[in-house]
Structure formats: structure tokens, C-alpha cells
């Protein structure tokens, strides 16, 4: 683990509640990341924060630390939730809850998830048991509020994570509905984090926060200076052979392949599964229980490759992703940054390989204008690509055994055509 992404600010030197500090130190947190170093002195003092930082920079622990500290420092006897953390996706909500578990044992505060898809009875049981902190997506939280299962009248902390993504997904009305069910901004601590502090996000902060302080951690470049970016211009008929060939040569330990449509993702998955790769498929049509299982398998190393649509581009907090492939260049230039931000996290390096094919090459100029630099172009020899591809699977079989090997039976040398 690289440490040069950390600041000189020690958690022990901040005015933290002793139980929160114990939880941090027992989990190996000694120094703050830049966003933590900037935001925590403000939020620990009880002041609202609107923070901008890239994904993978420690935003989650920044607001969790502040939330647990605030609740412990301002105890209230109630069976109602005292903190509300809103996220744009189920996966991000689950990840936040997972990270919060690091503090639950030491602090004694209880969390509960609230997201759509499945798990209704389990979620309801946790909420009715007296959760201090509700973590979830806006739609399911509103359902519980309207059914009088959750009361927001005792909320002391409101957190909005990935605020820009909330706007993109059309959740702004839900956010405002929930915020106005909570005590007024002056009676609560409100923390907002976003990859961009756009006009819309700042407007929300102005209307629903109490004179927030803005903190920004500007990256050296939008795509992260530890990510090596590479671009190929394949013909449509070369795309799949090129992907298979690059996987043979790069031999990524853990990679995510993004495509623009569910159909394309299924096609990629079929070819890779037939080729013996341990690969999972993550699209919007995959059932929630299966999605969580796939993410766990990928995180635990049971899967080496995840093929995903942009539904999974935001909110995936998976360590040690070495490679990201853009099989299709995204139509939205910001999605390029969100996609490749899955690698090169927490001070580690990463590789991003993109295909500018006949269908999506038109998206490249807008992407390069947005990230502020040209992506290095690599050439390939079409005659050297692997073309004897196995017939792709069409139905998802059980997880294949680990027979991931190259065509000579061993890990190949690093060789580029």
C-alpha cells in the first residue's frame, strides 16, 4: 500500500471522541487523507461541510468519522434514527454500511440499511430494533417514512454522498423531501460530498445546509495521476479478439470491463467465460442478491474480471483493481472518469485501456477535452490477435473453476504485439 496519498494530519491530533479514535486506530487508520484532513476539523466542530474529492480518496471515512463523533458527543435518548446517510445506488449504500461496521463494535451505535430490490424484511427488522444510523437510497427510505416505520424528527446528522450522481439519476426531489422531514439545517449537522461541486450541487447546499464551508481536493488531473491511460482504435471485428489478446498479455489480477449496453456486456461475458476466465456480469437486470454476491466474489478474489454497465460505475469501492477496460467509450464524458476511477485508488497505481471503435470513437474529443489531455494511442497488429475464440456462452453457468490460463498453459510474458 502506498502511503504518499496521505496527509501529515494524524487522527490522534484531532479532537475526536475517544471511542471513534479507538475504532480508527484499531483498523489501521493513523494519518488522514487530504479530504479527511480538510473536512474533519470543520465537521468535528459541528459545522456543515460541502466537500469535493475524487472517488477513492477517503470521503466515506471522512463523513462516517464525523457522524459517529457527533452522535457520541451529543447523546440523545430515543428509539428513532439519529443520522441519515443517503447514497445514489444500492451498492454504495451497502459499501458505506460495511465501512461503518469498523466503528459499530467500539462505539455501540447501530446501523441499518434501507434500499430497494430485496431484503425488505431483514431491513425492517434492523430498523425496528432501534438503529441509530440509517444508510440507504432515497426511494426505499421514503417508503419507510410514509409508512411511519422511520421517523426523521430526531435526526442530528444528514449525509449526502455522491451528490452529483444523485442529480444525474433524478433524485433531487427525493433528497429535498427527506431533508425537509428532518430538523431544520440549523438544528442538525449536514455533510455533502461530491466528485464535482457543480452549480446544482451548490444550490442544494445553499438551500438545505447551514452556511457550509466548501473544501476541495483538486486532483493533478481529473483521471488521477497514478492511472496509466492507453487507447486503441480497433475495427468492430477486431474488438473482441483485441480484448482477449490484451487480457492474455496484461494478465490483470483484478479488472473491470465496461460496455455501454446490457447486451454488449452479456456478449463480452459469454466470450470470456467460454475462454475459461473467472468472470462475473453486473448489469441493471441482475437481481440484487446476485449483485451483492458477485461483488463479494470479486472483492474476495473468487472472480478475476467483472463486466459491467455504468449502473456499477459509481459507488464500487473495491480495493486492488489493477485494470479497467473501456470496451466502449462512454457517451457521457464524466462516465469515463468515474469508470477508470475504479483503479488507481488510495495511492496505488492502475491501468486504463480504452477502445475507440467505429461506433463510439466520436465520443473521444469530448472526453479528452474534459480530462484536459490526450490519451496515449497504442498500435496493434491485426494479424497477431487471437482469433480462435471459443463459442460464447449464452446462459450463465455456475462459476467456472479456476482454469484461467493462457493458451500455452502458463502465465504469458509481457509482450505487446
UniProtKB/Swiss-Prot annotation:
Record-listed ATP binding positions: 53-60
PROSITE patterns the record matches: DEAD_ATP_HELICASE, HELICASE_ATP_BIND_1, HELICASE_CTER, Q_MOTIF
UniProt domain Helicase C-terminal: residue ranges: 239-386
NCBIfam families in the record: PRK04837.1 (NF003419)
Similarity comment text for this entry: Belongs to the DEAD box helicase family. RhlB subfamily.
Self-association and partners: Component of the RNA degradosome, which is a multiprotein complex involved in RNA processing and mRNA degradation.
Descriptive protein name: ATP-dependent RNA helicase RhlB
Amino acid at each position: 500500500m502506498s502511503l504518499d496519498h496521505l496527509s501529515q494530519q494524524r487522527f490522534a491530533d484531532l479532537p475526536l471522541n475517544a471511542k471513534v479514535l479507538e475504532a480508527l486506530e484499531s483498523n489501521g487508520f493513523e494519518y488522514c487523507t487530504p479530504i479527511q484532513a480538510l473536512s474533519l476539523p470543520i465537521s468535528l466542530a459541528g459545522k456543515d461541510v460541502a466537500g469535493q474529492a475524487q472517488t477513492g480518496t477517503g470521503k466515506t471515512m471522512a463523513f462516517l468519522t464525523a457522524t459517529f463523533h457527533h452522535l457520541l458527543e451529543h447523546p440523545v435518548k430515543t428509539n428513532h434514527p439519529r443520522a441519515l446517510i443517503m447514497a445514489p445506488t444500492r451498492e454504495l449504500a451497502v459499501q458505506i454500511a460495511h465501512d461503518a461496521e469498523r466503528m459499530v463494535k467500539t462505539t455501540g451505535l447501530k446501523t441499518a440499511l434501507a434500499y430497494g430490490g430485496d431484503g425488505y424484511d431483514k431491513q425492517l427488522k434492523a430498523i425496528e430494533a432501534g438503529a441509530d444510523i440509517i444508510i440507504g437510497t432515497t426511494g426505499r427510505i421514503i417508503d419507510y417514512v410514509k409508512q411511519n416505520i422511520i421517523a426523521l424528527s430526531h435526526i442530528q446528522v444528514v449525509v449526502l454522498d455522491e451528490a452529483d450522481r444523485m442529480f444525474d439519476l433524478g433524485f433531487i426531489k427525493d433528497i429535498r423531501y427527506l431533508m425537509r422531514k428532518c430538523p431544520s439545517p440549523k438544528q442538525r449537522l449536514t455533510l455533502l460530498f461530491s466528485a464535482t461541486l457543480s452549480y446544482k450541487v451548490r444550490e442544494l447546499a445553499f438551500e438545505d445546509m447551514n452556511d457550509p464551508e466548501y473544501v476541495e481536493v483538486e486532483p493533478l488531473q481529473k483521471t488521477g495521476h497514478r492511472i496509466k491511460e492507453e487507447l486503441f482504435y480497433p475495427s468492430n471485428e477486431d474488438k473482441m479478439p483485441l480484448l482477449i489478446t490484451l487480457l492474455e498479455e496484461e494478465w490483470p489480477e483484478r479488472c473491470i470491463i465496461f460496455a455501454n449496453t446490457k447486451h454488449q456486456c452479456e456478449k463480452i461475458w459469454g466470450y470470456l467465460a467460454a475462454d475459461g476466465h473467472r468472470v462475473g456480469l453486473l448489469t441493471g437486470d441482475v437481481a440484487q442478491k446476485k449483485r451483492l454476491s458477485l461483488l463479494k466474489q470479486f472483492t474476495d478474489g473468487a472472480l478475476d474480471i467483472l463486466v459491467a454497465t455504468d449502473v456499477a460505475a459509481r459507488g464500487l469501492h473495491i480495493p486492488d483493481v489493477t485494470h479497467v477496460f473501456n470496451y466502449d467509450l462512454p457517451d457521457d464524458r464524466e462516465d469515463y472518469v468515474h469508470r477508470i476511477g475504479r483503479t488507481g485508488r488510495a495511492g496505488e497505481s492502475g491501468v486504463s485501456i480504452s477502445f475507440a471503435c467505429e461506433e463510439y470513437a466520436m465520443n473521444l474529443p469530448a472526453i479528452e477535452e474534459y480530462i484536459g489531455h490526450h490519451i496515449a494511442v497504442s498500435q496493434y497488429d491485426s494479424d497477431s490477435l487471437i482469433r480462435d475464440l471459443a463459442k460464447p456462452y449464452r446462459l450463465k453457468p455456475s462459476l467456472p473453476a479456476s482454469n484461467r490460463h493462457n493458451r500455452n498453459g502458463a502465465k504469458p510474458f509481457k509482450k505487446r504485439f
